[in-house]
């Protein structure tokens, strides 16, 4: 059995070798000749999986180690009798922590407290729910917009997008990309929406590039609209609008979900799905794969305020480490993908062990996802 895996899927070689012969290949472009005798294909979001790629090939199963699936023609796979699995929620924690890193940086730079801001979350799935929970643990007001969930009657106080635009100081998008249909998200943030944002608002897109109309956004920024912008995703990736990058406050190369934990979850989820598909079901404990964190332990004295939280968050991950490299190489062919391929190891907050002498600080840090314990001062 021959299994092709994306060369940038951590632990893929070791795991899938339990099931067959493994060949690691680049995801963009994928070497088509390798598909001629392969039984399974494991990809990431950079690989377009459709009829033109797989027609006439012996592939029986496709797995994507990503939460999103807009790069996969699921309907054609089903029609062709090819098994499929994604990894929903695998990088949700990573994306939430990317948003926090960005907001805490902007808050420090511009001198505001997040408690004074209302955060509008568009898309309340794996990412949106976790973001809401962490923000509310800090006492920060959130407004939720998710029409599909609202129409299904899911639990939640869902508002219209217009209401979020009117009342939110921070608007962050966490939706799939739907190009048509009743829940279309293509250019959900169009010129009208962008112009309607509150003066000084923060706009964040860490889902799919085309959810925000990049041309319209650049037009508004060029005209002097008072707006802070965080973009991790771009229309036309791996190409991006260099002029737009120059205007945004934070710009990164589609790496919001790129923690080691998130990548490992994606790999293990599709591994487990494929093992079940071929009748050799196996399960993997994530902590048996991950290395020891870079940080040992730190001690925190007193309560948890915003500056302290910012220091802890940026000790684990400071978004500026990914903004600067993109600006240096933007517009150079191949460099966007190279940044992603050679991405520095990044961990999640849970990798940081924090000893607190304040019980409320320890409790709050645990709610936020840190590995915190309370040890009273002697």
Swiss-Prot record:
It comes from the Bacteria. GO terms for biological process: 'de novo' pyridoxal 5'-phosphate biosynthetic process; pyridoxine biosynthetic process. It holds the Pfam family DUF3410. One of its GO terms (cellular component) is cytosol. InterPro entries: D-isomer_2_OHA_DH_cat_dom, D-isomer_DH_CS, D-isomer_DH_CS1, D-isomer_DH_NAD-bd, Erythronate-4-P_DHase, Erythronate-4-P_DHase_dimer, NAD(P)-bd_dom_sf, PdxB_dimer_sf. It is found in: Cytoplasm. Its main location: cytoplasm. Homodimer. This is Erythronate-4-phosphate dehydrogenase. It comes from Escherichia coli O6:H1 (strain CFT073 / ATCC 700928 / UPEC).
